Amino acid sequence: MPINDLQQAAQKIAGFLATLNKLGGLRLKYRISAGSGAGDAEGMAPALCVELAGPDLPLVTQRHGELLLALETIAVQILRLDQREGDLVSFDAANFKALRAQELRLTAETAAEKVRKSGVPFAFPPMNSRERRQLHMVFRDLEGVETASSGEGPGRFLAVYPEGKTNLPVVPPVKPRGFSRR
C-alpha cells in the first residue's frame, strides 16, 4: 500500500522524531521532504526523505548507521507500510548514505578483482536489503562476476562468484566479535 497522504505521513514522522528527542534526551534536528521532489543519496526516489542534523548526529551514524536504519524501520512501522515498501521512506544524516554507497562501490570493485584473479567466491558480511541491492546493481556493471544473496534474516549476505560458476561453494561470513544485530 503506497503512502496516500504524504503530508499526514510527514506529520506522523515529525511527531515520532519530536517524541524521540524529548523522551530520549536527544538533540536532533530534522527536515522532511515529501513527494516527487524527495530524493535520497542512493539515487532512489522515496516518497518521504528525512535529513537529520544536530549535536547528537554521531550517535545516528556510528556502527555503520544502525540507528539510522532502525529509525527508518520504525518509521515504516508507524506508517503501517508493508515491509517490501520500506524504500518509500529514507532517513539520512550528514550525507552518510552517499558516503556509504561510495564505500560499497569501492569494496565491490575490489571484491570483483579478487574473485576474477583467484576464481574463488567472496562473501560480504551480512547487511540490510537496501545495501545488498546496491551491491547487486554495482556488480551488474562489472564484468567476469555474478552475485547472489544467501542466508536468512539479519544473517543474509551477498556472495560474488566468477562468471558462470555460481555452483561453487561459498564460505558464509563470520560476524565480528562483540557485534550483535537484532
Where do the language-model regions lie?
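Intrinsic disorder
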Residues: 2-182
